[in-house]
Amino acid sequence: MLLFTLCFFADLENGGKALASPPGKWQKADVRFDSSTAFKSLVVSPDKKTVENVGVPQVVPDNPERFSSSPCVLGSPGFRSGRHFFEVRYGTQREWAVGLAGKSVKRKGYLRLVPEELIWQRGLWFLQRLETDSDKLQKGSGKIVVFLDYSEGKVIFDQDGEVTTVQANFNGEEVVPFYYLGGGVSLTNL
């Protein structure tokens, strides 16, 4: 994997504005969707880089790793240390979220996408889309970058230049990429 030095880095204390000097190096993760965790209406591409919610339940084994009630899927690899980032391309569809989850995140039953459930995420929701400039939506897809600084307990989201930092307590647990996809949504790991 390549090491990248970021030109811009954001911090909540600075109002989400880019800082002039990056605080170190980050390792780009080659993230793949873990089809054994995918909710039954999610279809993972053969190369495991794209997932789509087709809205129709697929015939899949009901294994313990699979999300049973929420249209979610996890990615790999997982992280227990270091500074990592991954990028995800999204379309103009609504109802999606991208982030990180504790490896022990609840798989059976409905999830609340909150830190108390070991999920740190950002995305596009229906009400946000109604408030969004329609010209922006017509431009097509965008990109969200998720940064993890495990030792500092920080998850940083850069969604098309809008940066948010979330403080997290991982309690030594492995964290993995996390995705929520509403009906018709497709996401691609870059």
Curated annotation (Swiss-Prot):
Cellular compartments per GO CC: extracellular region
Major subcellular site: secreted
Pfam families, per database record: PRY (PF13765), SPRY (PF00622)
Signal peptide (residue range): 1-20
Expression by tissue: Expressed by the venom gland.
Keyword tags: Neurotoxin, Secreted, Signal, Toxin
Keyword Cytoplasm carried by entry: no
Positions of the propeptide segment: 128-190
Domain (B30.2/SPRY) ranges: 21-127
GO MF annotation list: toxin activity
Function of the protein: Neurotoxin that produces dose-dependent hypolocomotion and hyperalgesia in mice. May directly act on the central nervous system, as it is 6500-fold more potent when administered intracerebroventricularly than intraperitoneal.
Annotated family: Belongs to the ohanin/vespryn family.
Name of this protein: Vespryn-21
Species whose genome carries this gene: Drysdalia coronoides (White-lipped snake)
Taxonomic lineage: Eukaryota, Metazoa, Chordata, Craniata, Vertebrata
